[in-house]
From Swiss-Prot:
Organism expressing this protein natively: Stenotrophomonas maltophilia (strain R551-3)
Binding residues annotated for Mn(2+) 2, in chain numbering: 262, 267, 285, 346
Record's protein name: Probable cytosol aminopeptidase
Positions annotated as active site in the UniProt record: 274, 348
Cofactor note: Binds 2 manganese ions per subunit.
PANTHER family: CYTOSOL AMINOPEPTIDASE, LEUCINE AMINOPEPTIDASE-RELATED
Length: 492
């Protein structure tokens, strides 16, 4: 159940909610709202802090009941850590800590006052917007396939944010909706979230919002366009491919921003079958597609004054007697031929045709997003996405957007010196580059299909989902991409 968000202008002590959320630092210093409650209660918070019953350490939460002079029956004190080190990551963690502490139980409504706490190099609008996004992320529950285990609706349902910037609140709600949309798609099992399902979801959303439209290409239409690379990957699956094209038209005659997202709804590896574990997590191989759709949802709900096109090649990489093989030579939509060195390097084979298709929209910028390589995860871990581009201005825009919302990317080189690693004797290009620099050679491969474009590639293999049996889709980098689009709209 998604949280409902409002703004609050009243003093915390008189707010009629089930719980107030305030903060304390490691040295027992209280935030302004906490100081007001302390004064109203006759110094109760300060006394608790001094005797060690109220911790200001990062991650600590203390729930207090029935403070005198305070209307709300509960006060949640969230530890903020050292005041001198309090910044963006600490603020976002505090939001999540608060919501997780109230996620289940008797509290239905709360007032979050930490949005009034100063965060270095960030303004009040940022604090409100990011509080909404982080709170909604922490409150997310997956219930689609739980059946008899379906979670109940108990727990926090309404969160008032201290502040008065209605636009920031609305933008936060829009981006939070996009993140949640992407996470839900990513978390669905592959027998639910097929290429056809992704297409249906896109059509349904576009049909519900003025200014949005959807076009779905089936395999026959893709064949007519010459998408031999994408269709080769699709050959082994009973779930037939789709090309999902979503358009948001709110920027007049301006050129659109185009996002392309890898939509491999399940990846067996093909003939090069995955044998080293982790195959059960390959439903997340469509998170690039899910996340660009989520970004589309955010842009539409925020009514951003720009034109946006999202292209998702939705394909399942499976195995049957018709599956493509290592050493096959396939012809892409661009006319370039590709020698298949490994059928488990399939993401780039569907993206190359999608990138060629996307150029018909004459993009102001073209960005592809993909869980493309394990090599990127080895290099950068789960903390950051990999970014590759030959366009410094575009790369810097994306990097800055990621830093702004703590959904970060790290730039990797895309030098011409790597390109010979993709040489083939039998085709124009080989689809793998060998043992070394795997994330970079994958980016180099894609760059051959984005020539003449202001293009960037985001490898999100390390950030798209959490690891392990209880891991879930994260929705990254919807935050980065949405902030980038907000920045572009502000400059228009």
């Amino acid at each position: 159940m998604a949280l409902e968000f409002t703004l609050n202008h009243l003093a915390a002590a008189s707010a009629a909610v089930d719980c107030l959320v305030v903060g304390a630092y490691a040295d027992h210093t209280l935030t302004a709202a906490a100081q007001a409650l302390d004064a109203a209660s006759g110094g109760r918070l300060a006394a608790l802090a001094q005797r060690g019953d109220l911790s200001g350490k990062t991650g600590a939460t203390t729930l207090l009941h029935d403070l005198p002079g305070v209307t709300a029956p509960r006060v949640l004190v969230v530890g903020l850590g050292e005041a001198a080190r309090f910044g963006v990551p600490q603020y976002l963690k505090a939001v999540g800590d608060a919501v997780r502490a109230l996620k289940a139980g008797a509290v239905r409504s709360a007032l979050f006052t930490l949005s009034e706490v100063a965060v270095k190099d960030r303004d009040a609008a940022w604090a409100i917007r990011q509080a909404v996004i982080a709170a909604d992320h922490a409150a997310y529950r997956y219930t689609a396939t739980l059946g008899k285990k379906k979670a109940d609706d108990a727990g926090l349902a309404q969160l008032a944010i201290a502040g008065d910037d209605a636009q920031a609140l609305a933008q936060g709600q829009a981006i939070a909706a996009g993140v949640e949309f992407a996470r839900e798609l990513g978390n669905l099992p592959p027998n639910y979230c097929t290429p056809a399902y992704l297409a249906e979801v896109g059509v349904k959303f576009a049909g519900e919002h003025d200014g949005a439209e959807a076009e779905i290409l089936d395999e026959h239409q893709m064949e007519a366009l010459g998408m031999g690379s994408l269709l080769a990957v699709a050959r082994g699956s009973a779930n037939r491919p789709r090309l999902v094209v979503l358009k948001w038209n709110n920027g007049g005659d301006a050129k659109p921003y185009v996002l392309v997202g890898k939509g491999i709804t399940f990846d067996t590896g093909g003939v090069n079958l995955k044998t080293q574990g982790g195959i059960e997590e390959m439903k997340y191989d469509m998170c690039g597609g899910a996340n660009v759709i989520g970004t589309f949802v955010a842009a539409v709900k925020a009514k951003l004054p720009l034109n946006l096109v999202v292209v998702v090649p939705a394909v399942e990489n499976a195995i049957d007697g018709n599956a493509y093989r290592p050493s096959d030579v396939i012809t892409s939509m661009s006319g370039k031929t590709i020698e298949v060195g490994n059928t488990d390097a399939e993401g780039r084979l569907i993206l190359c045709d999608a990138l060629t298709y996307a150029q018909r929209f004459e993009p102001a910028a073209l960005v592809d997003v993909a869980t493309l390589t394990g090599a990127c995860m080895v290099a950068l871990g789960h903390q950051t996405a990999g970014l590759m581009s030959k366009h410094d201005d575009l790369a810097n825009e994306l990097l800055a957007a990621g830093e702004q919302v703590f959904d970060r990317a790290w730039r990797l080189p895309l030098w011409d010196e790597y390109q010979p690693m993709l040489d083939s004797t039998f085709a124009d290009v080989y689809n793998i580059g060998g043992r070394w620099a795997g994330a970079i050679t994958a980016g180099c491969f894609l760059s051959r299909f984005a020539e003449g474009q202001r293009w960037a590639h985001l490898d999100i293999a390390g950030v798209a989902s959490d690891e392990g049996k209880r891991g879930m889709a994260t929705g990254r980098p919807v935050g980065l991409l949405s902030q980038w689009l907000l920045d572009q709209a502000a400059r228009a």
